[in-house]
Structure formats: C-alpha cells, structure tokens
Amino acid sequence: MIHQKYPINWKKKDFSIMIFCSIPNIATGILIKGGSNHFVVDPGDGILRDLNQEIGMKQIMDISDLFITHGHHDHVGGVWALLTYMRVMHKTSPLSIHYPEGCVEIESIYNAFKKVYSKTIPYKISLKVIKQSKNFKTKNITVRPFPVIHKEYLHDGVRTRQVPALGYSFIYDGIKICYGGDTAYCEDLVKQAKGADLAIVEAGHEDDTPDDMHMTMSEAKSIGESAKEYFLVHVPE
C-alpha cells in the first residue's frame, strides 16, 4: 500500500494521475494526464484552485472531458466554478461531461448554468449519459465505466436509497488505472481492479463500523492488493 497523503501522484510512462484530495463529505478532485491530454474526475470543491496551481489556465482550457462517479456534493461541488471559469477565460473547444444515468445533480447544474449564461457561453457542453458498461474512447484514452453500489440516507437518517453511481477504468498505451469512486464492496470493482496498474479504492469505514455505503479498510485493501499498485482514498480524517 502507498500511504495516503494529499496530493497523491502516480505516473507510468506518459500516463499519470494526481489526486488533489479525497475527503468524505468535503471534496474530491482528480486530474488524469494521458500524453498531452488532460481529464478531470469528480471535480469537487477546490478543483479550480488546484488545477490552476498544477497545470495553469491554458491547459484548463484544453480539458475535453469531465468524469462524474455520482452526484454527491463532495464529488461535484466544483463543477459550476469550472464551467464558469472556462466561460470567463473564453474556452472555445468542446467539453463533454460523462455521468451515470439518473444523476440529476449534474443535469441540474448544467441546466442552471445554461439558463444563467445562455448568451455568453463560448464553448459547447455535451452531457454524456452513461447507461451501460461499455468501452468508449475519448482523445487518446479508452474508458470503461462500471456500476458500483453507493447509497445515501433519506431525511429520517435511518433508511437509505441507492444513488446512480459508477466507477471508471482508464486505459492509455496499455496502462490501466481503475477508480471505484464511492462504493460498498461490489464484484464489478473487484473485476476491474484485478491486475490494473493502479487501483484507487475508497475506504470510508473502519472494520468495526461497516455499512452498505462505503467499504471497510479490510475490504478496500483486499481489492487494492489485487492490482499492481493501489491507493486507499476517502478515508475519514
């Protein structure tokens, strides 16, 4: 295991990932680089600041894709800021936002942004709803979305419901990074993480406080150890 300390950096050949942070209920933010292309995964609060410090304005303008695992605030809290910054700085190349079917948070953010700035958006935004686990390619990476199991509490704080949630495998030049997002233990993540060059696995609970929303440390480690390298993220502080 590689010990958690943010930001986390990993690189193999010309494929790299930087996890700016992954703190439950606060924020997540991930930057993936494949060659000269940049992609953002789960742009939580603070992502605009982190991207500016790491890659700067010009390369932010060149970002072509956002990948959303689910709609909880700690994973999408920076979307509005990122879209607005791209507008203010006159991005002209298109932006695709990939997200699970039923993720109303992303659709609501997009609709509100479009309503507020309908006459002054210089770039095209395409919502790409993911309805099935099927490989697709964008720029120079192959992406494999897969279903995961994540829930949220209802208003009574007792009952729960399933939320639309995905994990993603990113493949570039034969190198595979698997990111599970927020999830309970699930077989689809087990399959995707096995043999990956890097697995990023959430460990939202200690072993003595298991639930059906997040994995325990032991569960997360068992999945991570099936990959060549792994990070445990989303560990409560």
What do these predicted ranges mean?
Residues 1-178, 227-229:
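Binuclear metal-dependent hydrolase catalytic cores
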Residues 176, 184-237:
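Cap/insert and terminal regions of metallo-dependent hydrolase folds
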